Amino acid sequence: MKKITPYLLLALLLTGCYRDQGNYDYTLDSMNEIKSVTFIPSVVMTAEGEVIEVQQALDEQSCTRRIEATVEQTLATDLDALEFYWCRSYVDEQGKAVKDTLRTKGYMEFVLPVGKAMSYGIFLQIYDRTTDLSHYASFKVNTRPIFKNSLFVLHGSEGERQVGNIEVIGGETKIYTDVKVVTRDNNHYENVSGLGYTTFMNIPDDLTQIGVTNTLLLYASHGETKAYDPHGMDVKYTAEQIFKPVSETFAYHRTIQTGDPSNYTQYKVVLTESGEVYVGNYVHALYKPGMACENSADLPHQSDYTITAATITHNRFLLWDAKHGRFLYSSKDDNGFAIDEGNSIKPSFISSSPLLDAHVRFDGLQHSPATMTAVMGYINYRDNYDQQNAYFIFRDDASGDYYRYELLKLDIGDGSKAPQRRGAAAEVSEPLAAYSIVSEKRLVGLTPTHMSTITYNAWFTTSNLFFAEGGTVYRYNVSNGDKFAVYEAPEGYEVTKIKFRAEESSSFSDDLGLYLNIVLTDGTHGAVAEIKFTTAADVDEDYPTLFYDRDDAGHRWGEIRDIQFVYDYIYKMIY
């Protein structure tokens, strides 16, 4: 035993002194690895997690869909050694919860019901037989209503107008010069002259029916104005259910809309070509101001006017009456406005706030706007800020110059009991003004080809306006007159209209107001371009300039009359 012990100690000592040479050969380079898996259609991140959106089925022929997986591997170039397990969970048309597994290699087919929503929960295992390792992915497949977050395009000559659409789904763009190719509806769009849109959380009398509602307004002559569900173009309301009251001579001119639908502070003004005016809130209904007001001898309701420009402040609609060269105003807090869709069609809801003369004085100005052409009105901040001032831009037709006037709201109460100014002999003189012009500025360098292209967006500072001259869109600095080209049209095109996806930020609108849609014409056919800005109003160089001059079948746009981006109420949560 004593002889063995020294040998054991020597062996242990030699083992402890062994030097690791580091010559291991694990042959990792010879093992295949799944580096990434991507899908067509592509996955987007939403509040639900990763989701693939597919357009809803419109007929039996479009019910079966397919998702394809693209697998990037380090060694293999095919899918021969891979096994796919598509584990699915969903509720079928009979309301039964279903779980199944498909083993199709590289793709998964699934079925959608016609015209209905559908959702699949997917857990994908890709097993590599050469390594005995697996790669996993988890996502949802949701149906996407047609024309969701898309641009509607009204084009063609009056009497032959069509409604088209540009829709981006993942990496695919679908373009239709006629939506009837998709919707197969029998609607008449021939006399439509303008587009409008509202979306909000509708809270009806029956609280079990609470939900988001979306309404696309197609303004038309001959009493043909209608409100549609944009996701299918089903008629929701007729002219008699929209206008309070209906105008027999209605011809759409433009819409001014401000506020946040998520907190029910959105309001709008709709102007006609003949100077009629309608006002309203976030619901689709439109009211002639003061139709049910109690008239006052001291503050008479004004009904003789030609309204050509307007803006919306914290608590008022502020309008320019070109017929009498004056400003008018009306309260937004109108008890006659319906606050849900169901009640909006009832005859009992009608505007009760009078339209009043603001008695704004021009005698201290170098250039009175009374004889000028009103171009537009806007506000210097979001409309729920009660200290904002209003701005109106006018064009002097004699000189071609543009002027901006800033209006300060004066504290004379709520407007219904404005005190009268009295002279020394206790005789009534001019009533107090509701607004005062506090600044007058000539806008040097503002040279639009069409003055209707002058645009303001509340996403940016009040020093920035946008306008088009020829084929160029400019950002214009009101403070110093500098202008900077932000878009150049292709040769042969002229810009006729510019319109942001949204003109004011809201809780769920994310970056909608940074996208500018541009309408162009070559004299015969129209086209649509899109650019994106940064929050500093610079062009976002990371966003490609988009240009659409024909649909997927090669059909060209006619002359484009109007465009309207239709977005989801919770757009921010979806994209």
Sequence positions of predicted segments:
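Conserved blade-ending motifs and adjacent loop-strand segments that build the rim/top face
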Residues: 429-452, 482-509, 538-562
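C-terminal motif of bacterial Sec signal peptides marking the signal peptidase cleavage site
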Residues: 13-16
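Sec-dependent signal peptide recognition
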Residues: 2-9
